[in-house]
């Protein structure tokens, strides 16, 4: 049996994995925030939210790390391929945030206040596909809580 093709494929796969890890690690250690992600407009009742969309693995992994500030009407929407119990931490995140764990129909399942640089996990109460991070206090100041609805393109019914 010729193992050369298997070894070659294994080495290529390992090289690709290491390159991805290196790219992500360099972005995180460089201390550069992600500022050029695609954007979409969401609404929470009468309130407009300008969100960056982190839909790819490496975008979700970096999230809002290294940001020193964020305008009050802005946030980041994390989009996962499938609903699941999503857990977030605040490694390298310098601003206090609240994570809204959001179901496919836009209903907020639960909220979690998160402190800067805290590496404790904050998880969804049930499987969700979306997590919306906003400045801490934004949801509370607008009386938006679990059961409230977020609307916008990501939450439109799928055919």
Residues of each region from the PLM?
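Compact, glycine-rich, soluble single-domain proteins
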Residues: 28-159
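Bacterial N-terminal signal peptides that target proteins for export
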Residues: 2-13
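N-terminal signal peptide c-region/cleavage motif recognized by signal peptidases
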Residues: 22-25
